[in-house]
Curated annotation (Swiss-Prot):
Keywords: Glycoprotein, Leucine-rich repeat, Membrane, Phosphoprotein, Repeat, Transmembrane, Transmembrane helix. It comes from Mus musculus (Mouse). It is a multi-pass membrane protein. LRR repeats lie at residues 142-164, 165-186, 189-210, 213-234, 239-259. Disulfide bonds: none annotated. InterPro entries: Leu-rich_rpt, Leu-rich_rpt_typical-subtyp, LRR_dom_sf, LRR_TM_domain-containing. PROSITE patterns: LRR. The chain crosses the membrane at residues 4-24, 371-391. GO terms for cellular component: membrane. Residues 467-483, 725-736, 746-760, 785-805 have a biased composition (Polar residues). This is Leucine-rich repeat-containing protein 66.
Amino acid sequence: MRDFYVRVTILVTGLCFVETVTTPSRKSSVSFNPEYQRNGDLLVNWSSIRHVSQNTDAMDRSFYFFRVLFQPHTQKERHIKPPDRTHHRISKVTLDPLAHLHALEILNLSNKAIHYFSLDQPLPPSSHQKRHGGHSHSRLPRLQVLILQRNQLSGTPKGLWKLKSLRSLDLSFNRIVHIGLSDFHGCLQLESIYLKSNKICTIHPKAFKGLKKLQVVDLRSNALTTLVPIVTIALELPHLELGLADNQWQCSESNVNFQNITSSSWREIWKAICNMSVENKRPNAETHQIRKSRDTHLLLSPPSDLKSLIQSKAERPQAGMDMHLSALGKEAKDGYGDLRGMWPQSPVELRDSQDEQVTDRKDDKPPALELAICLSVFITFVVAFCLGAFARPYIDRLRQQRCSNKRPGSDNAYSNKGFHGDIEGAQHMEYQGTDLHQTTHHLHLSENQNPSWVAEPIPHSAVQSEQMLGSNGTDPGHQQSPEQLKDSNESRSGDSIVLPSGPVAHLALHGLPNADAHKAISPVQHHHDFLEEAHYDTVAQEYSLIDDVMDRSSITGPLGTFPSSVESRRDDLHPSQPRDVVASFSKTLAHANTREAEGSMETGCPEPLGAMDSQMGSSEERQVSNSIRELATQQPSFQGVDAEERLSHVYSEVLHNDPPSLRPRWGSGHYVIPATGEPVERDAPFDPHYDLVTNYESDSDEGSLFTLSSEGSEDTRSLAEEQASVENDGTSQPLPSRNLGEYKDSVTSAESVEDLTSQRIPEKCEAQEAHLRNTLISGPDSCVCETNQENDSSSLDPENRSTWPQLPGHKLSHHETLGTYGDIEPQSEAVDWHYSLRDLESPNVDSSPSPPYSDEDLSGPEDRARKRSKHW
């Protein structure tokens, strides 16, 4: 804003003193207009000479002054020099206003569109003529160079003879048509005349007569057709260099006669000119061969040097006028470089196509497009880098929050709404084949199933460790994690079936269809599905399970302790085994009698329970017990044999010995309670949140599985004998015969349906005691099984108790008793069956492990071998 105010002030001041500016003195005008001053000589570039008043010229200068004032600072530096009026339009020019400039040497009036230029003025009055005396005829006495190129002149300037010091005259690029006799008369100091690119068609032969110092005449690109005047000029001035290219020469036969008169050198020149005229027929065309020759119109070298150079060139033959002119131009350029730099030349003054200054000015323009692209790319990279640097911490923070919010076991969690809650069942689960749990979901087996679908038995030690760690919790080195305890509590609180959550090895059912299906089956639906299935197909599987349970229960010490040899054996055989497949045989005794009664009612021929009891004797019951003990005795040798081979033998033997009368006689519909009987009440689930002793009375009979049998009194006596033998040994080891003996002790007499309700009340305490001692896990893969009984009087061995292997397709043998059936109910979680009621009541009992063999199995290895051979 401050600069703006200053400029306004200067503008107002200049307008106020317009009078002063319009009438400057001579001295001030001369000092304002000079462009350069060198060695005391004043060099003035007067381009405002016109036939107008001095006031108009002064106003033009004042306008230029104010225009420079209001331009930006960057443009002011360009206009520090005096104005260059090379492009102003001037119609007529005279040198009278410049007559007082005695020191003027160079006058450049190019590109002014001048139509007329004259130095001849009418004589002043006599008084004025007397005042100036002899100086009246002398105008611009020191002017040496006059440049009038690129104008509209139709003829040579008039009165050139008055310029006594003129050495170079440039009239190129005009419209000159004719050169007369007196055009250059009296210019005795003239050395070079440039008439290039005009329309000259005729030249007077004596036009250059008397110009003894004339060295260069450029007549290129004109309309000349004949060489007669040129030859005349050349003869008069033998040292003269002529530029005759690009003319319309007519090389006819008449010129041949003229060539015979001239010398050989002129003949060669004539031939060269004729050849060039044939190639270039356009009269006004320019060539680049003598483009540099125009630089020679300002010469500072002495005339003697130029004469010697021209004479040496003139002696050569037709080496051509163009060659002489180009060489002369090079020499003159070196000597005249200082003089040429004394005044600025506009790029328009040299209008030919090869102007170097115009080319250099174009090259100086900055590449705006390339610069913009480079800047945009650089800015893009910088912005991207800044965004990445600032956004990286926020991205890392969001990723950490996402990882922290994600639960570690969410990927391996196994959730099923059929169970009670989400169970992380697949945390360490290794699927080696088709799981036994999966087979019970699709258990629609028939008698003609392939016997190769055999369940491989598991080593016996894993069930013992799982039960001890899952229910006892007294081992300080094997404490349950909070997640496992929570899953155990949730599984016990309802009737849901819990998959093992620890490292479990599953039974692989080879070739069983629909083995990969995972479905949620409720306990009621599971119970009904078992009634629709053929129970003959799973006897071999129950053999392996019972054998494994009995073997582990025999070596399990009280309060969860067991020998180190068994611990090592458990580690060698298998790292982990399922806890919910151990008690499948114990559940086979509940459904059979009920289904028998249902089948009788459906067929219309009900069989009384008394008749069923009459078919069974006490001897047969003992045979069943002895058969189980024999299987427990044969466990060591049974484990050494291939699982598939042993089960195939058992399958074939049982399949061929099954009597047709023992096959199921009920339909395939859902389970329906007989009309003559009352529905049996379900036991309540066991609640592990309370103490075992305090919860003893309030615990439901969920895990107590009742079966219908007529041999309750005899089985009660065998149970009392086995408990007495265990107490005499001073241990609190649980009886392993709960799967057969205890459940048969708790069986009510089925003489009538009304006796079932009355008999359940006194048997509830015994069932709860057995439930606390020996409740086994029953998963969703529990199935209806029947026991294979044989005649053997040996008692159950506490050490050799194991789970009986289950074989699909197995049928009831003729040794089995009709009344001994097991009913397996889905139970929540395994309750520690290693304790008896006496252990809970008297905690000070000795907890030393029981001897590996009981008194009933001290007969020796021969008897056991005999029993094994008898069984197989």
